[in-house]
């Protein structure tokens, strides 16, 4: 349908800007066969010059929208000049989400202003815009894996001097997504200094997958609260909805747990590099206003060390040679045989439940447990022999399960409900015996092995729900130099946005795709911190966002022109997103190919 409207689009734009001269303009753009072609402007021509972004908005099926809508996406044929100071948002149904709706409305206006390049000043002439928000469930503001994120967006002229935009949704989250889409329908005519808006719009949209996330490891290196909020801001711009906070590990314990203060006092990298309850609440609220749940992970029983030194509840901490006991230094695992450990866990979980109070799920970690580490402890060996267990792989799985069941009970108690729990793939989750240990109704399994791992099919056939984080496409720390020794890191090479985009959960899961809740890009932080965060994540995470929102049947080539634009939009937001191509390619579509 889009190809048939290209001539109409050009006519529509001409009608709106016909009276404006462009004598000083050197270049103009024209839509030709789905590409915006750069042409030398002729001031004597009766055809006014068309700006690049105005051309891109209509020269392909989804305009400049990211992620692409999954339902109807009719962008009409016309752009209207808009007065930036005459945009009003009106909430038609009041309820418990009023504060969130008002915050979203304020942010929407800020997002609209992103269409204006730094240093440009739009003319304050043009039509007024009235945005009407119709939330059918204005009292519902809880995250859930079943929440309705759908929305409908209608834009149409209203008389000679106004444009009406109406967003309808069944939740605040859908409403927020609709505002995000609407903000992307504004472009700046840098030839005439006018803010423009698509005048006739009909969009129906909803995500394919309910879980669309980014994991950030803030234990191996510290990230400022400002950088975390900046990440969530960018996530909201591309409709990602879960910030998975891997907040502790063996290298540091920066989470301020008031019930066990020695953990962070002894475990933080410095007294300043901690996450207080007030700071976490700020992040959680920031995420809620942007439709992003903040999901805590307390990784156990492995990946513990710093902070636990004086508890007598760990084994093999800083053991040497480390390669014999863990996958990276320092080693450390909890001792499941210590009864006192489980009160510690309940206290940590309770402190997390208090501050991460919007989460509907909880991540318990559970990867890379070393049998050799546990087997190095006399007390653990004695416990296993008392229980008539051997010291073999199967018996250590029993010990691990002993820990997991007790930790599970403490998590339910701390959160005050039986919430879904997430575990990483591991020897405990092996499909050959997982149902001996983990109930498929209680646990979601997050896959970090490759996308062709036979474990995926085995887990799906047994009815388990999965989140895909296969490292061969979604580990954003891959492709850098080794941090122990020389050479490249373990999961090299670097993963480009194209591979991220083409990593389809539906293709991986096939007939079991309904059991896949979504996916998540992971940034493990051995070699990243606040100063490198943006470039590691963006714009690659935007590729993940469209894959999980739309699950397109097409590949990255069809999305490239929009991908280049969303990168530019992120930069305008203050995100230091990595450059994908020379800017020349953005201005000359179709020339930069292999």
UniProtKB/Swiss-Prot annotation:
Give site residues, Important determinant of glycosidic bond specificity.
327
The family database entries (InterPro entries) matched by this protein are listed as: Beta_hexosaminidase_sua/sub (IPR025705), Glyco_hydro_20_cat (IPR015883), Glycoside_hydrolase_SF (IPR017853), Hex-like_dom2 (IPR029018), HEX_eukaryotic_N (IPR029019)
The way its activity is modulated is described as:
Inhibited by O-(2-acetamido-2-deoxy-D-glucopyransylidene)-amino-N-phenylcarbamate (PUGNAc). Inhibited by thiabendazole (TMG)-chitotriomycin. Inhibited by 6-(dimethylamino)-2-(2-(((5-methyl-1,3,4-thiadiazol-2-yl)methyl)amino)ethyl)- 1H-benzo[de]isoquinoline-1,3(2H)-dione (Q2), a synthesized non-carbohydrate unsymmetrical dyad of naphthalimide and thiadiazole having a dimethylamino group at C4 of the naphthalimide.
Question: Pfam families of this UniProt entry?
Answer: Glyco_hydro_20 (PF00728), Glycohydro_20b2 (PF14845)
What this protein catalyses is:
Hydrolysis of terminal non-reducing N-acetyl-D-hexosamine residues in N-acetyl-beta-D-hexosaminides
Q: Which GO terms describe its biological process?
A: chitin catabolic process; glycosaminoglycan metabolic process; polysaccharide catabolic process
The record ties this protein, via CDD domains, to: GH20_HexA_HexB-like
Question: Which cysteines in this chain are paired by disulphide bridges?
Answer: 31-59, 36-55, 316-373, 326-331, 478-491, 585-592
Q: Which GO terms describe its molecular function?
A: beta-N-acetylglucosaminidase activity
Q: What is its EC number?
A: 3.2.1.52
Recorded phenotype for the gene knockout or disruption:
RNA interference of this gene does not cause any visible changes in phenotype in larvae before pupation. At the pupation stage, 20% of the larvae show abnormal phenotypes. They fail to shed their old cuticles completely before starting to form new ones underneath.
Q: What does the entry say about activity and pH?
A: Optimum pH is around 7.0.
Concerning biotechnological or industrial application, the UniProt entry reports: A potential target for eco-friendly pesticide development because of its species specificity and narrow substrate spectrum. Q2, the designed non-carbohydrate naphthalimide-based inhibitor against this enzyme has potential use as pharmaceutical or pesticide as it selectively recognizes chitinolytic beta-GlcNAcases, but not glycoconjugate-lytic beta-GlcNAcases.
From which residue to which does the signal peptide run? 1-22
**UniProt-annotated glycosylation sites, renumbered to this chain:** 164, 375
User: Which superkingdom?
Assistant: Eukaryota
Provide the function of this protein: Hydrolyzes one beta-GlcNAc unit at a time from the non-reducing ends of substrates, with a preference for shorter substrates. The 2-acetamido group and the beta-glycoside bond linkage in the substrate are required for its activity. Active with p-nitrophenyl (pNP)-beta-GlcNAc, pNP-beta-GalNAc and chitooligosaccharides (degree of polymerization from 2 to 6), but not with the complex N-glycan substrate (GlcNAcbeta-1,2Manalpha-1,6)(GlcNAcbeta-1,2Manalpha-1,3)Manbeta-1,4GlcNAcbeta-1,4GlcNAc-PA (GnGn-PA), pNP-alpha-GlcNAc or with the long polymer colloidal chitin. Involved in chitin catabolism.
- The protein depicted here goes by the name Chitooligosaccharidolytic beta-N-acetylglucosaminidase
Which species is listed as the source?
Answer: Ostrinia furnacalis
